[in-house]
Amino acid sequence: MVDQEKAKLELDKLNKQIQHHDVLYYVQDNPEISDAEYDELCRKRNLILNAFPKLTQSNDYQNNIGSSPDTKFAKVKHEEKMFSLDNAFNQQDVEKFITRTKKFLNINDNQSIPLSCELKIDGLSFSVIYKKGEIYQASTRGNGYFGENITTNVKTIKNLPHIIHNAPDLLEVRGEIYIDRCDFIQLNNDGNNFANPRNAAAGSVRQLDHNITAQRKLKYFMYTIVNTACLTQEELLYQLKIWGFCVNEHTITTDNIEEAFNFYNQVYNNRSNINYDIDGIIYKVNDIKSQHILGTTSKSPRWAIAYKFPAAEAKTQLNKISIQIGRTGVLTPIAELSPINIGGVIVTRASLHNKNEIERKDIREGDYVIVKRAGDVIPQIVDVDKNLRTQELTKFVFPTTCPSCGSSVYQAKQEASIYCTGELFCKDQILEKIKHFVSKDAFNIIGFGKKQLLFFYEQRLITNITDIFTLEEKISNSDVKLESLHGWGEKSMSNLFSAINNSKVISLENFIFALGIRFIGKYIAKILANHFSSYETWYNEMLKLAQNEDYSLNIQQIGSKTIGSLKMFFSQPHNLNMINDLVKHLTITDTQSSSYLSLIHGKIIVFTGELSSMSRSEAKIRSETAGAKVSSSLSKNTDFLIAGNNPGSKYKKAQSLNVQILTEDLWLQYTQSSEN
């Protein structure tokens, strides 16, 4: 009895906490805690209710979904309650859901249940009612019983039909409103301060001025029809498409649980390629009649469960903001964090981007911050928990001199980045420039790791790029005996000197890239090399560009920013001296290019699936030689998708974006010279 009384007190405490956070999340669109922390509160509450079933009868709060509607909007009653879903956090939870479902439907264990597997969009749930084919009312989910009337705002959403043909006289559809990540970034760049895309979508829908909502580029996906005549969820989604609604393309139907788990893993591993936030996979019993038999609990349907992804966000303490100097002199602030597990990866550092980002989010050393990790993207700080901030924490002061060399810093026009003026006097810049110079896509000198470069620099054996090619001579004439130092032996030294000598014959493209000129990446270096063909022609044209104010370049795909960077680089005497010293040690080969006549010259292409004629890396080289730019991600700017065997999700995405799809054979033809 005493245990139950203690449990009741803990349950009341949890209910108050959850209710508080529901208001912040569903009404104010300003959550204080992460989704993972909220899920943990709900998990603790469910543990108590499962251990003490009698408390369920007095726990009225569990019947509520979300929070009461905002009083700024008219209240709307849902004729059919809008439920939330139960969550699963591992495969065992999903398997238990399958077992419960089979038991409820009197299905044998050896029989399977077809499931509709759909993405769980991290947005705002909404309902739209049509009367006689015309949009009548739209509302939020609210607490499940009552929502907010958002009809005027919802009508501003692009691609939402205002009139539907061949529909029942009374039709209610439900879905999720969201905002793309790229539109979210632009929204914050325009002066807003939303913590994440979900908050941005919810806040935009709840604007009192629908003209503001119209500017926010909201999108939606529909996922259900209330009281549908369809026989399956698969048929239901198809019917929504027929009526003109946006329906998510990443959906499969399967009666194989392993295939359902594989779908989860595929989406989880590739979610960074999807331009909107998803936080799990929803498994629904595909048969609508079975859904009706299963029914609902007070809070959620028994015929569906949301298998949540591991938290992509987590809260931890920011211990220090350090400044990293790159090879171009950019001062990049880095957050040094208390170690935190995010999606199975231990994160200790996160990007803070620039000075403006720190000031906009008011990030301070000692703060507790929300860290987000998506795919292979560098972890980023998306928000600060200011409720946990103590009074002694002061605003971060961005350095006015370079932390590495003490040189003054400056902010370039129309840029957020701050630069060190030290250049060749800045240790960090020099080391980063040398590291870039010896990298795989530049001189490709194997044996020059970060530790080795730092050692040679501290021994004053390599203080600039040219020193690499006199290293062997310097060592033989110095008192430093590498053989006596840890990590160096006769063989490792011989291998290093051999790699340096082998690198002395280099293509013009790799040479240009190796110089580390601002805005000159691998692709631009290839365009310049193809255009000028020889080192002598390129160098002389660069001198003209730097010395003659009226002289400019007219090269396809080379913009004014890049030309300005070339002009600045070749205007500096120390850069010219460095190049002239370098070429004394090198043989720079001319570019043999026939790419101008290729049908994919100047095009952006993406590969998907397995190629039968060559490896992916060989295909990349072939395409780039033909003048194309090979990208790993698909967007509306992509010109061609090259589809091999067993193409992935990019194939469907290309169709939706109207990107032209080429077979492997056709791509091979396109890479040929059109003169042949």
UniProtKB/Swiss-Prot annotation:
Highest taxon listed in the record's lineage: Bacteria
Domain BRCT: 595-676
Function: DNA ligase that catalyzes the formation of phosphodiester linkages between 5'-phosphoryl and 3'-hydroxyl groups in double-stranded DNA using NAD as a coenzyme and as the energy source for the reaction. It is essential for DNA replication and repair of damaged DNA.
Enzyme type, top EC level: ligase
EC assignment: 6.5.1.2
Disulfide bonds: none
Active site positions: K120
Cofactor: Mg(2+); Mn(2+)
GO cellular component: cytosol
Gene3D superfamilies: 5' to 3' exonuclease, C-terminal subdomain (1.10.150.20), 6.20.10.30, BRCT domain (3.40.50.10190), DNA ligase/mRNA capping enzyme (3.30.470.30), Helix hairpin bin (1.10.287.610), Nucleic acid-binding proteins (2.40.50.140)
Catalytic activity from the UniProt record: NAD(+) + (deoxyribonucleotide)n-3'-hydroxyl + 5'-phospho-(deoxyribonucleotide)m = (deoxyribonucleotide)n+m + AMP + beta-nicotinamide D-nucleotide
Record keywords, A-Z: DNA damage, DNA repair, DNA replication, Ligase, Magnesium, Manganese, Metal-binding, NAD, Zinc
Binding locations of Zn(2+): C402, C405, C420, C426
CDD domains: BRCT_DNA_ligase_like, LIGANc
Binding site for NAD(+): D35, A36, E37, Y38, D39, S84, L85, E118, R141, E176, K284, K308
SMART domains: BRCT, LIGANc
Pfam families: BRCT, DNA_ligase_aden, DNA_ligase_OB, DNA_ligase_ZBD, HHH_2, Nlig-Ia
A biological process term (GO) from this entry: DNA repair
Family according to the record: Belongs to the NAD-dependent DNA ligase family. LigA subfamily.
Designated name of the protein: DNA ligase
Organism: Ehrlichia chaffeensis (strain ATCC CRL-10679 / Arkansas)
GO molecular-function term, one example from the UniProt record: DNA ligase (NAD+) activity
InterPro entries: BRCT_dom (IPR001357), BRCT_dom_sf (IPR036420), DisA/LigA_HHH (IPR041663), DNA_ligase (IPR001679), DNAligase_adenylation (IPR013839), DNAligase_N (IPR013840), NA-bd_OB-fold (IPR012340), NAD_DNA_ligase_OB (IPR004150)
